[in-house]
């Protein structure tokens, strides 16, 4: 059995539930999801940043440290679309004023999160990424500038040193073959 999970710190189903509860309690005083000046200003407040990061990290401790670990130990193949590196990148872009890496909860996440057997990073030029976001009708797409920062880190950043980088402009069959070879499902020749 295969278990698939998409996760980015602060945008998991668990975190969406928490944000929904806060919106219900606080009403209009809480900014809506997505990119906005109001949201950016709110998240720049030290206590709001700390609360948001703490909640997101607790959620990830449960998701990675309990759900992913348990399913893996039960013999399921677990596929994580986005993982710790993506979350670290998100946190650094969204909270440049916070040294989240020094937070005890962040160190706990790293400790409880299972290490992947294989990691892949499918790279696309920013222009194609923007095009695909429009086609998928992403509700809160990243700006061109943010995508450029992400791509630079994906290509050169130490966060992703252990990832197998794949040119996602290649055909689907070529990409599939590269992944299957890396997983040992095809002859490496």
Question: How should each PLM-predicted stretch be described?
Answer:
Residues 77, 82-152:
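A glycine- and Lys/Arg-enriched "phosphate-lid" helix/loop adjacent to the NTP-binding pocket
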Residues 47-58, 92-97:
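Surface-exposed cleft-lining segments at the edges of enzyme active sites
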Residues 127-189:
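NTP-dependent small-molecule kinase module
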């Amino acid at each position: 059995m295969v278990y698939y999970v998409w996760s980015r710190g602060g945008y998991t189903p668990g975190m969406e539930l928490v944000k929904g509860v806060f919106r219900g309690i606080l009403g209009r005083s809480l900014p809506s999801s997505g990119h906005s000046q109001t949201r950016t200003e709110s998240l720049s407040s030290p206590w709001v940043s700390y609360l948001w990061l703490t909640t997101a990290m607790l959620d990830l401790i449960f998701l990675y440290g309990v759900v992913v670990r348990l399913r893996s130990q039960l013999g399921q193949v677990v596929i994580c679309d986005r993982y710790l590196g993506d979350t670290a990148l998100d946190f650094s872009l969204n909270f440049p004023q916070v040294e989240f890496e020094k937070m005890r909860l962040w160190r706990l996440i790293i400790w409880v999160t299972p290490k992947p057997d294989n990691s892949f990073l499918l790279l696309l030029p920013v222009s194609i990424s923007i095009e695909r976001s429009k086609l998928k009708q992403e509700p809160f797409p990243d700006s061109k500038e943010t995508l450029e920062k992400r791509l630079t880190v994906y290509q050169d950043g130490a966060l992703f040193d252990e990832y197998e980088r794949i040119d996602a402009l290649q055909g689907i069959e070529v990409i599939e073959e590269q992944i299957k070879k890396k997983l040992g499902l095809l002859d490496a020749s």
